């Protein structure tokens, strides 16, 4: 925690999910999974510090690798417009590291709202990969329907892993798309799901303290989602480690001149249903977020969606 500048008394589910877990997972994605075990089991502070530094470094390497793969993916998609895409996206490169492909598949699925299969080659020259669903189909059902293409597969309805016959990889997208039309779920009209509708005046420390009493938040206890209708985009700023600009900070205002900052990690101006333009009015879905960066408390919003 000290290495990540997290104060133990303020440790929360976001710190675990976005700071600690990625570093532990980096051990299996980029190195030896035993490194994570050694960190959690050692009583030697010096050894723990050395391992923590190593995991932070390979986690940074993992981020760089994923960003590089995503640039390659976006370049390929630029040559293949969305209207030409199949119902299921299959994309890969023998040079891509298998351990990070689940992260890549998740990003592509979030962006294109389709099931995605991403593959690379492992040290045994086997084509392996990860898949993620947008919720329109169970991946287990989809892969079962297309089982003759796989040497192995497994997972659950939203995420999975697979090994493909080398000679069949170039036909996998077509086969999965045919299977998709057999096992896809009936499309349900999307609706805006939120807990509270309000103006921006509700965003204050007093209300945050009340929300905080319901923590820890997670899958079975999600953070309350607030809907702010017809708020104005005052300012858009990119930020990130070493000037990467991989995150967004947007300032919103409402009719009563209340102003609030809102952030979205790993996002850009094209990440939402509507284009982000200063002075544009939008509907904002967000949760409360208290930052304690460098010991300074700042209440802001975490963007769920912009409509």
Residue ranges and their predicted role:
Residues 1-22, 26-76, 131-307:
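Acidic, two-metal ion nucleic-acid-processing modules in DNA metabolism proteins
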Residues 42-43, 91-95, 109-117:
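Non-catalytic terminal/interface segments that mediate subunit docking, oligomerization
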Residues 79-106:
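Flexible, glycine/threonine-enriched loop-and-boundary segments that flank and lead into catalytic domains
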Residues 84-87, 111-115, 125:
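Short coil/turn connectors at secondary-structure junctions
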Residues 93-94, 106, 121, 166, ...:
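Residues immediately flanking
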Residues 104, 110-112, 117, 203, ...:
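Extended beta-strand-rich architecture
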Residues 117-133:
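Short glycine-cluster motifs
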